[in-house]
From Swiss-Prot:
Pathway: Amino-acid biosynthesis; L-histidine biosynthesis; L-histidine from 5-phospho-alpha-D-ribose 1-diphosphate: step 4/9. The active site is at 8 (proton acceptor), 129 (proton donor). One of its GO terms (biological process) is L-histidine biosynthetic process. It catalyses: 1-(5-phospho-beta-D-ribosyl)-5-[(5-phospho-beta-D-ribosylamino)methylideneamino]imidazole-4-carboxamide = 5-[(5-phospho-1-deoxy-D-ribulos-1-ylimino)methylamino]-1-(5-phospho-beta-D-ribosyl)imidazole-4-carboxamide. Transmembrane segments: none annotated. This is 1-(5-phosphoribosyl)-5-[(5-phosphoribosylamino)methylideneamino] imidazole-4-carboxamide isomerase.
C-alpha cells in the first residue's frame, strides 16, 4: 500500500484545515518546496498536493509553488483543487504533474472526466469528498444529494487511474479512518481507491491493510506527519512489507 504525504497550499504556505473548515487553519510551513523535498528524502514515492485556494475560488492561486515543487522533486506529484476545465487540467499536466484530481467537475461534468481519462490514460484521478455519505463540492462548501458510492460507480469503466475518497468528518481530526465507508467505496468501484482523512497514528495506517485486497491501494496522510505522530520512513516500510501479525490482529478487530 502506498502512503502519500499531503501538502495543502493556502496563499503559498503549507497548511491543514480541520474538517475542511477554512476558518480553522493550522500553518505548518512557509516553504512548500523544502517540505516536499523532506517528504521525498524520507521515502515518499508520490506526493499529494491540494490547492485550497483553487478549490474554494475555482481559479489558480498557487501555480508558482506547484511548479517549483514539481521541478525540485524526482517522484511523481499529483494535484487537486479547482481543476474544473479541460484547459486547466491540460495546463497542469503540461507543467510536470503526473496526475490531476477532479472533484467538483466529476459531479457537474462527468463527461469531461471521461474525455480526459481517455486522452491521458493513468493520469486522471477522481476526488470524492463525502459528508454523511453524500458528495460535497467547491472546496467542501456545498453539499449535494448525490451518494458518494453512486458517483464512484459512474466512473468504474471510465479509465480513471484511481478514486481518492475523503471523509470530511474525520479529515484533520487524527481520529482514525472511516473503515466502513472505505470498505463500501471499494466495493462500489472497480478502480483503485486511495483513502484520505483521519489518520492519526501508525495503528490507523495498519488498520487499512485488510482493505487492500478489496481495492484500497493507498492512503494520504497530512496532519499526523506534521505533528510527528507518524514517522514517514517507518510508515513507508510498514505498508510496503505488511506484517502478518498486524494484519491478522486488525482484521480480528474489524470482524
Amino acid at each position: 500500500m502506498e502512503i502519500l504525504p499531503a501538502i495543502d497550499l493556502l496563499d503559498g504556505a503549507c497548511v491543514r484545515l480541520h474538517k475542511g473548515d477554512y476558518e480553522q487553519v493550522t500553518r505548518f510551513s512557509d516553504d512548500p518546496v523544502a517540505q516536499a523535498l523532506s517528504w521525498q528524502q524520507q521515502g515518499a514515492t508520490r506526493l499529494h498536493l491540494v490547492d485550497l485556494d483553487g478549490a474554494k475560488r475555482g481559479e489558480p492561486v498557487n501555480d508558482s509553488a506547484v511548479q517549483a515543487i514539481t521541478s525540485a522533486l524526482d517522484i511523481p506529484v499529483q494535484l487537486g483543487g479547482g481543476v474544473r476545465s479541460l484547459e486547466r487540467a491540460e495546463q497542469l499536466l503540461a507543467c510536470g504533474l503526473d496526475r490531476v484530481i477532479l472533484g467538483t467537475v466529476a459531479i457537474e461534468q462527468p463527461d469531461l472526466v471521461r474525455s480526459l481519462a481517455e486522452r491521458y490514460p493513468g493520469r486522471i484521478v477522481v476526488g470524492i469528498d463525502a459528508k454523511d455519505g453524500r458528495v460535497a463540492t467547491r472546496g467542501w462548501i456545498e453539499q449535494s444529494d448525490v451518494l458518494a458510492t453512486d458517483l464512484a460507480r459512474t466512473f468504474s469503466s471510465s479509465g480513471i487511474a484511481a478514486i481518492i475518497t475523503t471523509d470530511i468528518a474525520t479529515d484533520g481530526t487524527l481520529a482514525g479512518p472511516n473503515l466502513e465507508a472505505l470498505r463500501t467505496m471499494a466495493a462500489s468501484s472497480s478502480v483503485p481507491v486511495i483513502a484520505s482523512g483521519g489518520i492519526g497514528c501508525m495503528a490507523d495506517l495498519l488498520s487499512l491493510l485488510p482493505l487492500e485486497p478489496l481495492g484500497v491501494s493507498g492512503v494520504i496522510v497530512g496532519r499526523a506527519l506534521y505533528d510527528g505522530r507518524v514517522d514517514l520512513a517507518e510508515a513507508v516500510r510498514a505498508l510496503a512489507e505488511p506484517r502478518l501479525q498486524d494484519i491478522t490482529a486488525v482484521a480480528a478487530d474489524l470482524a
